[in-house]
Amino acid sequence: MIQDRKKSGFPAGLQLALAFIGVAPLALPAQAATDVARDVWPVLLRRDLARVGHVEWRLRRAAGAACPVQAPDVGVVLDDRGAYQKRDWPLLAATVKMDEHPVVASVAPGSPADLAGVRAGDEVLALDGVSAETIIARRPAGTVVADALLDEIARTAPGKAVVFDLRRAGAVLQFSVVPVRHCAVRLVLFTDRSIEAHSDTRNVAISTGMLAFARTDDELALAAGHEIAHVINGDRRGVPAKVRRGMEDAADALGLRLMECAGYARATGITLFERLGSRDWLGFLRARTHRSWKDRTQSLRALPPATACPVAAP
């Protein structure tokens, strides 16, 4: 999913800001000032959507029933041209084959959709006999098409299959997919060059700058896992700094357990904090709600490996 795709063009040159979980945004010297060529950004954005979708699937499975809300999930990322400016529609059709119908942007390996035969690039014609056009027309105001379709899947009764009517290479195909029920938190990708991740009570927002900074999916999983941990723990804003610091420490620890339970490498993931620390040359601007990157890294390394998976509710 993506939250802000109305901006035309997709920047790859990075002027990164340290805004991820506790560092004030500070513009870094432009190391690669050139933007991605106009005709390439949809392909790169689709790649990033797939990357986030794969990490989301694994972390939601690892969280299991620990999240306050669980929902049926089949492991797909959906996309629709309506989330983009009309002037970009011809480019989207030419580069990522997205035209009038919503499409499957990615399928998580090993997910119900993957095992049933759904593939990236499939056009979504209907869900359970209800046309995509009908679902789109009745969606609440302000809801993007991809979310409306995923919400339709999330309302599936336990044990019931979702019937996908798809078009692939001109042929209309039908797949019956039985969702799994697990953590309902979704990862939302938004276009921003800052290194940022934040959460509310339902979703985790990940910036494209964070994706560019995270060298591996292990690092990305630690960032996302930290934010999912805030949701699991029911953390809220507006508390004293000392209390908030305890929340952040707990989210670090639970986020590490989540990424381990999801099958990611803890040692590789923790390097995210190390690399953020190496860039934090103005540490005096760090929020009092967070300990130093060095202290946080040391605390994570001292934690025992995760043993109980999926993680248990607090």
What do the predicted segments below correspond to?
Residues 210-219, 227-241, 263-264:
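Catalytic Zn2+-binding segment of zinc metalloproteases
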Residues 223-233, 250, 254, 258:
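Active-site His/Glu-centered metal-binding helix of metallohydrolases
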Residues 113-141:
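Conserved PDZ fold ligand-binding element
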Residues 33-72, 170, 239-289:
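Short helix/loop segments within enzyme catalytic domains
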Residues 91-107, 123-125, 184-216, 234:
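Active-site scaffold of zinc-dependent metalloenzymes
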Residues 281-314:
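Pan-zinc metallopeptidase signature
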Residues 39-102, 176-178, 189-192:
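PDZ/PDZ-like peptide-tail recognition elements
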Residues 140-184:
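PDZ-domain C-terminal substructure recognizer with occasional recognition of PDZ-binding tails
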